[in-house]
Amino acid sequence: MPKLSLAKLERHLYSAADRLRQEGLDAATYKDYIFGMLFLKRCSDVFDAEREKIVGAKVEQGMVKEKAETEYGENPDFYDGFFVPERARWIYLQDKLGDAREPYGSVLDKALGALAEHNDTLEHVLDHISFMRVQSNKRIVSDDACKDLVRHFSRYRLRNEDFQFSDLLGSAYEFLIKMFAESAGKKGGDIYTPRDVIRLMVRILKPMPGQSVNDPTCGSGGMLIISREFVEQSGGDPTNLRLCGQVNDASAWAICKLNMLLHGVPGADVRLEDTLLHPMHREAGELERFDRVIANPPFSQNYTKSNMEFPERFRWGWAPTTGKKGDLMFAQHMLAVCKPGGMVTTVMPHGVLFRGGAEKEIRKKFLEQDLIEAIIGLPPNLFYGAGIPACILVMRPNLTGQLPNPNKPENRRGQILFINADAEFHAGRAQNYLRPEHVEKIVSTYDRFEDIPNYARRVALAEISSPANDSNLNIRRYVDNSPPPEPHDVRAHLLGGVPVAEVEAQRSLFEALGFDATHAFAARSDAPSPPETGERDGVRGNAYFDFAPSLTDPSAIRPLVENDPGVQARVQALRDALAGWWSAHASRLADLPQHRKLNRVRSEFLDSFSGALSPLVVLDRFKLAGVIATWWTDTLPDFKTLLENGFPGVIDGWVDAIADAVDDDEAAGPTFDPFAHKLVRRVMSDYLDQIAAAKTDVARLKGEKEAFEQSNEPDDADEEELKIWNYAKDLERQIRELKAENKDALKELAKAEKVAAGNPSSKRKPHPLAGGGKGEGGMPAIRQSILAARARPNCSARSFACALREN
């Protein structure tokens, strides 16, 4: 049985959500039903596997199967995971699909209730899910929809051995949470922090095995999950990391608990209560302290002191209880529950950096005790439902009050690193995103604790506290990344020409690409010579250029650059350097299944790639690091598969992904083009070229067909014209038939590639559709027909159609 890939499972879940959208439900409503159904199916499938193992062991020992099933298979004491009672098992739910004696929604509710009743870990976790809920005298989810969901989730088994990598189900659950957050707007922001922001924060904290991580406003639990993921990918034991969270919303708490369970972290300690009023993690009556504290608290909220426990947490001051200025109260709580030598990272709105009043006094005390290590300005509109600018505070506690803060690394004491990253992001349709290259630059700058012009600067506390700055932490005050004004040459605007000064300003870019700018410009003969101009680029006394005579159209610029000898030489040097780097370091991937230290290999790739290509000065070190960071993120599911199934498992996954994309009817969700897959490009390049050429011909034929139809009416057409009326559609039909044949070709060729990968001496016979074959009716035949017809002199749409039919 092919293993489930993350992309396939995501499409499967997306289709399930589509079915509930047909009921008129929004994301805030239907998410609970998808979560509940997914959890039921997962628990049942895992239980079945464990039950088979328990019963099978007893049968091997000589026990009658029926007795083994009764005495051991139905005994909760023999199960390490969840015990699933009969009415919560998937086979029972399937059997009930045709039973009309009871509403099917009630069957599902009883299944959830029975599952929770038999497993203490699930106490109150599933209470909010009810398939019988009524709104405005109508069931929210109809019985038909409930049954469709069960049939839909019956398509795939969800045991660990069915997944390409063990954490696949947890990753799919994260996909669901993100999908719901995107649809829910501001409400989505309450439970979901973009994972690129979380990974940035976790990479700054660098949690290690044996430590404890706390998120006092944990939402769906993403910060805890990714902290665990970081430890695992660093080669550490993730089970030796204590995860604790607290959230003040019952629905978010349930989502978080399910997230932990589906990621295989049943021991995560997640509490339901208001963190500022009643912090729940305690030891011997005192607040528990943690090695790493990470959070994205709700922005700009009021709070109350009424019945507040442990008020000594706020020894740096009290923010106003009204006016939506409770942000620094969360920051103080995080410092109060952080161990000596620990670290804090928290997202904050920019207002906490510069507002006056009580917040300013808290800020002053933070500075006086040297608590802040770095302030990172983030791009706007990163967070769901919050368009206001945000930043990340990196802090270390100072319980002794000694100055400078002894918990900071020695070279960071008495100063703050300001990083202004608000201009570097990917602009999406509804919100902005941090790409891996942006995260890599921020983390690298923080780790090096270095100054970078217009991006980062270390500032002494004395400068910040001076009368001129008055404890104002506004990032732009210390790192202004405003772009320089665009130069405007009035004379060039009026009389034409390209100022030589503007060309000179881009000289470093031209040189990096190996391009000689004089090939694109020529001396402007009608321009007077300013006295100060002198000789520049062989054009004496001329302050303006014209474009070269060969550049008569903007479309000519690209070929001029691409065909420039210097550019071609630089491109070849880049290719050679890349090939040399890959040849020297690709073998590191082969060692991954042994040591499992993904982060170490990633770091080695980043450093070695930059070292190999930076001498070419085409890209700076941050751009080079971004290339590897982006590639690594895109390839991470394959790396996870490699760790657990080796290279054959990776190639199996590629084959299955290609086949799924061709065959899968769940196409509404996240998809990819199978013809763009790396494996298809490698083994079927000729065929892909022919497909592209045929598509070009189809587009041209459509245009000719439309012109033909506009000048000829069907009623007036003779028999000959009627025969060729739909010639373009005939060709499109042939293309569709070819693609249908290609389903098998994709699978056969990919499997042949897998065999060849395992046996270098194997000989592959090319598939007829891949070019060079003798199959009939394939792309070569169509392509030859097109070429033969188009080669005829005076080929009109009508004569071309006739010729095509003859061929």
Where are these regions (language model features)?
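Non-catalytic, mostly N-terminal accessory regions of nucleic-acid modification and defense proteins
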Residues: M1-L205, P209, R271-M280, G377-P380, ...
